[in-house]
Amino acid sequence: MSGYTVEVDKRRTFAIISHPDAGKTTITEKVLLFGQALQKAGTVKGKKSGQHAKSDWMEMEKDRGISITTSVMQFPYREALVNLLDTPGHEDFSEDTYRTLTAVDSCLMVIDSAKGVEQRTIKLMEVTRLRDTPIVTFMNKLDRDIRDPIELMDEVENILNIACAPITWPIGAGKEFKGVYHLLRDEVILYQNGMGHTIQDSRVIKGLDNPELDEAIGSYAQDLRDEMELVLGASHEFDLEAFLKGELTPVFFGTALGNFGVDHILDGIVEWAPRPQPRESDQRNVEPDESKFSGFVFKIQANMDPKHRDRVAFMRVCSGRYEQGMKMHHVRIGKDVNVSDALTFMAGDRNRAEAAYPGDIIGLHNHGTIRIGDTFTQGEKLRFTGVPNFAPEMFRRIRLKDPLKQKQLLKGLVQLSEEGAVQVFRPLDSNDLIVGAVGVLQFEVVVQRLKSEYKVEAIYEAISVATARWVYSKDAKKLEEFKRKCSNNLALDGGDNLTYVAPTMVNLNLSMERYPDIEFAKTREN
């Protein structure tokens, strides 16, 4: 086996998905702790303690205790090299999360065991279904009072339509949480309270019938034996093939805050989750074992380092090996670029990448030429598909407090729209600037970032826009006629793409009927 294949086989690239507040950022912290990347994990709540969670690294996230942007972290675990993408749990940032899920080979789904399956989890699972992404499940918060574990698994099976195979099973919960039984290893791992910031050196008791178990946990031992008979009869056995097809999920129980059960998940991901997978392009499927380099950009982040006022494009490597100083072909603009300063990430800590392999995420410095969805190759004219921009659902007019700063405002808005967090539209026949977003929180984020990063103070005003659609036509004459007749509803987005800005849904439907040769698109790929 070649050294290249060994490197590809080692990679595990996954994202964590959950409903807000299910404990996703805490799990990210603990996963890093096991990867020896952090000696003492920061907690998300109690932000005044100064020990902020490592993956929530933008100022605004630190203030609010929510993850707004996708963080990327790489760390070794056992014989694997893990690339973990932490996605925003907050609802308004679903586009960012959606695009992140195009860059991973498996997902860890985190569920709050007191609440069960929640709305956001359902939506995210629909996205993973599009590519049959394998899912590992973690039932979190066992150190609190929880719902019945069998009931929780039934809910996952019925609502998310995926079979559950328990790998670990909880013994007690809340103040009486004693630990878990590992079904595949036939061993009980005991929980120690108050070890949330360090790796627990847990006591392990081999075998359900071991008398040591009765000594250690008293009557819970017999309850566990009785329960296991029921569980084994009522649940699925783990089946690797079904897992890889996205039909079955291994289920682990634990508490991220108490740092218990996280290593069990990591063991499962390293053992079962797939190596980097082939990727679809407009020409063919690209295999990870191909020698020529290729990759696509799924995210752009401005001002990762306020000291440098920079923008970084996050690229998933799909095939070949990145080497410092190599020449890449930027397919959309048809230019070759030399890349000598790509970055690897430890959540905001950036290091220069010496080399990168399929499954790795590298950062390219972006001076305004790279867009979300762009493909880079070693010359081949192919384009990876499936990294969309979505039409926003909410709109506001944005206005300056100081009219002399129009230039800075436009620059800031265009850069923020390149990140895909919001979209900016410039109407063809007015000087207005319209901001479009998926949710209200995004509007707040934009005003705050304009102020802190671009020194521009802006306010919003209501505007009668119901929706926007990107417009195209194969018939250039018909497009010109459409532009002439509908100019008061047309705008250019941040990438200068023609967009129809509809005041009402009725107006949009009438226009679509009136102009059958014009395509009104809800999504757009670069």
From Swiss-Prot:
<dbReference type="GO" id="GO:0005525">
    <property type="term" value="F:GTP binding"/>
</dbReference>
<dbReference type="Pfam" id="PF16658">
    <property type="entry name" value="RF3_C"/>
</dbReference>
<keyword id="KW-0963">Cytoplasm</keyword>
<feature type="domain" description="tr-type G">
    <location>
        <begin position="9"/>
        <end position="277"/>
    </location>
</feature>
<dbReference type="InterPro" id="IPR000795">
    <property type="entry name" value="T_Tr_GTP-bd_dom"/>
</dbReference>
<keyword id="KW-0648">Protein biosynthesis</keyword>
<feature type="binding site">
    <location>
        <begin position="86"/>
        <end position="90"/>
    </location>
    <ligand>
        <name>GTP</name>
    </ligand>
</feature>
<dbReference type="Pfam" id="PF00009">
    <property type="entry name" value="GTP_EFTU"/>
</dbReference>
<dbReference type="InterPro" id="IPR041732">
    <property type="entry name" value="RF3_GTP-bd"/>
</dbReference>
<keyword id="KW-0342">GTP-binding</keyword>
<dbReference type="GO" id="GO:0005829">
    <property type="term" value="C:cytosol"/>
</dbReference>
<dbReference type="InterPro" id="IPR053905">
    <property type="entry name" value="EF-G-like_DII"/>
</dbReference>
<feature type="binding site">
    <location>
        <begin position="18"/>
        <end position="25"/>
    </location>
    <ligand>
        <name>GTP</name>
    </ligand>
</feature>
<dbReference type="InterPro" id="IPR032090">
    <property type="entry name" value="RF3_C"/>
</dbReference>
<dbReference type="GO" id="GO:0016150">
    <property type="term" value="F:translation release factor activity, codon nonspecific"/>
</dbReference>
<keyword id="KW-0547">Nucleotide-binding</keyword>
<protein>
    <recommendedName>
        <fullName>Peptide chain release factor 3</fullName>
    </recommendedName>
</protein>
<dbReference type="Pfam" id="PF22042">
    <property type="entry name" value="EF-G_D2"/>
</dbReference>
<comment type="function">
    <text>Increases the formation of ribosomal termination complexes and stimulates activities of RF-1 and RF-2. It binds guanine nucleotides and has strong preference for UGA stop codons. It may interact directly with the ribosome. The stimulation of RF-1 and RF-2 is significantly reduced by GTP and GDP, but not by GMP.</text>
</comment>
<dbReference type="InterPro" id="IPR027417">
    <property type="entry name" value="P-loop_NTPase"/>
</dbReference>
<dbReference type="InterPro" id="IPR031157">
    <property type="entry name" value="G_TR_CS"/>
</dbReference>
<dbReference type="InterPro" id="IPR038467">
    <property type="entry name" value="RF3_dom_3_sf"/>
</dbReference>
<dbReference type="GO" id="GO:0097216">
    <property type="term" value="F:guanosine tetraphosphate binding"/>
</dbReference>
<dbReference type="InterPro" id="IPR009000">
    <property type="entry name" value="Transl_B-barrel_sf"/>
</dbReference>
<dbReference type="InterPro" id="IPR004548">
    <property type="entry name" value="PrfC"/>
</dbReference>
<feature type="binding site">
    <location>
        <begin position="140"/>
        <end position="143"/>
    </location>
    <ligand>
        <name>GTP</name>
    </ligand>
</feature>
<dbReference type="GO" id="GO:0006449">
    <property type="term" value="P:regulation of translational termination"/>
</dbReference>
<dbReference type="InterPro" id="IPR035647">
    <property type="entry name" value="EFG_III/V"/>
</dbReference>
<dbReference type="InterPro" id="IPR005225">
    <property type="entry name" value="Small_GTP-bd"/>
</dbReference>
<dbReference type="GO" id="GO:0016149">
    <property type="term" value="F:translation release factor activity, codon specific"/>
</dbReference>
<comment type="similarity">
    <text>Belongs to the TRAFAC class translation factor GTPase superfamily. Classic translation factor GTPase family. PrfC subfamily.</text>
</comment>
<dbReference type="GO" id="GO:0003924">
    <property type="term" value="F:GTPase activity"/>
</dbReference>
